[in-house]
């Protein structure tokens, strides 16, 4: 998102244009409108993410809240019964604590018995609670700060000591029959599921990778070839690809050293600069690769186990890229691209019928191409595979025997005739100045421009011929 300075500059320009009499009211109206636009955009992104199975803003459903309340009542009642029967709390099954990091006690120390006295049990199971009144909300358990929070943060805690008395709003826990003790640092630093980190794209404007280092022209040339072969980097724009290359970290690996091990969690993607590596699956050699090759791609997408063991068969020089850096670069580039193309697309008349959600999907599918003055973008008679929007620049449209028939500029589009009618290109389009175009492939054209196709057909210059 735009930085605060950009927002102030936009506001300043608006003030200079409108010259409002009531400045404060104008400012209030302006920023209220900007906030509404931003919130609308964020919610549309949430809908788009949900359609792809990604949850941007996790929440607790009503069903989960009811289940949690029931579990809490049952838990409190069983503790109270145990207390009244004279059974010590140590005889009750221990609870596994996998709670939010915002509660008073850490989740990774050990299994801890939750000692609730009969007073707290009775309070928890009171009729008011049972009837659903004042039930724990979404933040009551996760962000609960009780009297225990007065303890010093850096105070030493015996991991085997019993847990202090919980507050009345403690988060309900799952009971485990005959639990096995966990190591003290169990899962404290690593994820065990196939997942990705949560990132905020609006915080990436001024971010620079920790291992960022400008590479020499020779290194850039070699790494571009290696990166270009990999499907993960094919759709990156030139700036993002350059950032990836300059974020690669050089690693020297001696002969015989194990680089990655089958079954381990993957954190890095590797490019072989020099040397040879061998791949083993279940201790069986399956492949060998040398300079220019790469491996470990899935580590950039998911925190997934390694599919093979890789060993350096000679002394090797590798370039490594960690998953978090790649995801930041990819997300930051995609977010900026979506913002940029949303502004472009909503100003193109034929796309007025698209919703913000549809424009966002269209923006994700667009690729960028550059043409210098005199270069041909499409040629008459060729097979049509792409639809084009001009982001900036100028181009001439010409036909054989007729010469230049029209000129195109920013916001204009071309290439739709061949896609609509499955015909060869009906004209040649040549850049007359440096021109940047956004292109949409044939499959994306048919899939994403459904509401617009009818408008394009009405504006088809060859329509009278069919």
Swiss-Prot record:
Binding site for 3',5'-cyclic AMP 2: 350-466
Gene Ontology terms, MF aspect: cAMP binding; cAMP-dependent protein kinase inhibitor activity; protein kinase A catalytic subunit binding
Disulphide-bridged cysteine pairs: none
GO terms for cellular component: cAMP-dependent protein kinase complex; cytosol; nucleus
Phosphoserine modified-residue sites: 193
Residue stretches of biased makeup (Basic and acidic residues): 109-118, 200-218
Start and end residues of each stretch annotated as Dimerization and phosphorylation: 25-231
Bias (Low complexity) ranges: 71-80
InterPro entries per record: cAMP-dep_PK_reg_su-like (IPR050503), cAMP_dep_PK_reg_su (IPR012198), cAMP_dep_PK_reg_su_I/II_a/b (IPR003117), cNMP-bd_CS (IPR018488), cNMP-bd_dom (IPR000595), cNMP-bd_dom_sf (IPR018490), RmlC-like_jellyroll (IPR014710)
SMART domains found in the cross-reference section: cNMP, RIIa
Region Disordered: start-end pairs: 71-90, 109-139, 154-179, 193-218
Swiss-Prot/TrEMBL keywords: cAMP, cAMP-binding, Nucleotide-binding, Phosphoprotein, Repeat
Quaternary structure note: Tetramer, composed of 2 regulatory (R) and 2 catalytic (C) subunits. In the presence of cAMP it dissociates into 2 active monomeric C subunits and an R dimer.
Family: Belongs to the cAMP-dependent kinase regulatory chain family.
Protein name, as recorded: cAMP-dependent protein kinase regulatory subunit
């Amino acid at each position: 998102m735009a930085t605060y300075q950009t927002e102030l500059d936009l506001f300043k320009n608006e003030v200079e244009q409108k010259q409002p009499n009531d400045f404060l009211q104008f400012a209030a109206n302006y920023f209220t409108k900007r906030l509404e636009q931003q919130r609308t955009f964020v919610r549309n992104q949430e809908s788009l993410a949900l359609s792809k199975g990604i949850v941007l803003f996790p929440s607790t459903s009503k069903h989960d809240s009811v289940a949690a309340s029931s579990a809490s009542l049952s838990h409190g009642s069983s503790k109270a019964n145990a207390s009244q029967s004279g059974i010590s709390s140590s005889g009750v099954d221990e609870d596994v604590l996998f709670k939010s990091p915002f509660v008073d006690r850490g989740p990774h120390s050990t299994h801890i018995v939750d000692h609730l006295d009969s007073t707290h049990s009775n309070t928890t199971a009171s009729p008011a609670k049972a009837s659903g009144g004042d039930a724990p909300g979404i933040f009551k358990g996760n962000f609960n700060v009780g009297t225990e929070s007065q303890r010093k943060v850096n105070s030493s805690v015996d991991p085997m000591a019993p847990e202090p008395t919980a507050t009345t709003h403690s988060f309900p826990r799952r009971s485990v029959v005959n639990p096995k003790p966990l190591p003290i640092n169990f899962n404290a630093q690593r994820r065990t599921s196939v997942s990705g980190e949560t990132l905020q794209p609006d915080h990436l404007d001024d971010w620079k990778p920790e291992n960022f280092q400008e590479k020499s022209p020779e290194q850039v040339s070699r790494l571009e070839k290696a990166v270009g072969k990999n499907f993960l980097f094919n759709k990156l724009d030139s700036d993002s690809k350059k950032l990836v290359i300059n974020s690669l970290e050089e690693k020297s690996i001696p002969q015989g050293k194990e680089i990655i091990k089958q079954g381990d969690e993957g954190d890095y993607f590797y490019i072989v600069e020099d040397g040879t590596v061998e791949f083993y699956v279940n201790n069986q050699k399956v492949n060998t690769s040398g300079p220019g090759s790469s491996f470990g791609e899935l580590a950039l997408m998911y925190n997934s186990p390694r599919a093979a063991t890789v060993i350096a068969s000679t002394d090797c020089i590798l370039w490594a890229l960690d998953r978090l850096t790649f995801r930041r670069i990819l997300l930051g580039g995609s977010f900026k691209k979506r913002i940029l193309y949303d502004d472009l697309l909503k100003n193109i008349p034929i796309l007025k019928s698209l919703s913000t959600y549809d424009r966002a999907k269209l923006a994700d599918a667009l690729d960028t191409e550059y043409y210098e003055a005199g270069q041909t973008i499409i040629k008459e008679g060729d097979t049509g595979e792409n639809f084009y929007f001009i982001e900036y620049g100028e181009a001439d449209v010409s036909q054989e025997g007729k010469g230049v028939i029209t000129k195109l500029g920013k916001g204009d589009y071309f290439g739709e005739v061949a896609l609509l009618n499955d015909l060869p290109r009906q004209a040649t389009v040549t850049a007359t100045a440096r021109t940047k175009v956004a292109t949409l492939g044939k499959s994306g054209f048919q899939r994403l421009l459904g509401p617009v196709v009818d408008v394009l057909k009405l504006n088809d210059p060859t329509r009278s011929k069919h």
